[in-house]
Amino acid sequence: MTLFKIYLFLYLFGFLVPQKTTHPVLDNIALPVTIAHQGGNKEYPDQSMLAFDNSVSLGIQILELDVHRTMDGILVIHHDASIDRLTNKTGMIKEMTWDELQDVDGAYNWTIDGESYPYRGKEVYIISLAQLIEKYPDKVYDIEIKQMDPPIETDLCTMLRKYDLATDQVIVASFYDDIINQFHNICPEVAISLSVNKGTKLYILSRVGLERLLPINSVIAQLPLQFPSPIGKLRLDKRYINAFSKGDRQVWVWTVDDSSKMKEVLDMGVHGILTDRPDVLMSVTQ
């Protein structure tokens, strides 16, 4: 009864903030939502055209990817800020030109077993965001902004508008509130994903029924099964999913590669799964 009185007080005096609950991009995806994390990087090299081609051929709905910007202003698809981990060269993407990146073996160090390198020397390159969009103009994209400095939010917004994707074919995400808020200010028509930081706050508020205190302009929450917080590790559960899933909003979980775990989280009520194994996910959801 006390909690109800608190809630009523907050409601009557305007402390419960309006929250966004739908977006046109949600009309372009069906449940359960299948998302290829980095294109499916346990089947083909991370975020390579080979990986994206494979996921599209399997029928994956959404291609998830990360973006950075080269020194000469090209948005490229790559997880790390540097090219050191996967390629045969070293350097920071923001300090390299597009032409320099094209002289790199993008899968030189890519391996599944830690011993063999099946795509070394096979002409696997780091690709640009424009290349992928032009090849698959009708796909839905889940784009994480990785680069913080210099900022690339304006460049990304310009590209999404240029290719007419902004309204209903893109979800933009970032681990950092400042980045996602800045992008939303520049490109308000694009759907944005809840940051992990705000997701943690929502989790804590949902424990006491006060989730409406948190302003939310995101229609999708992308979270791991477990995530850290000031009060210890939190585990995604039905209570959290119900707290976020107002209107058409959806909860997607990452990164799930095991078929039994995929079935478990779908039974829990998640709407979508990000996976490095799109073949496994499609076998579960078809």
Language model features: what each stretch is:
Residues T2-Q286:
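Phosphate-group recognition and catalysis centered on beta-loop-alpha active-site segments
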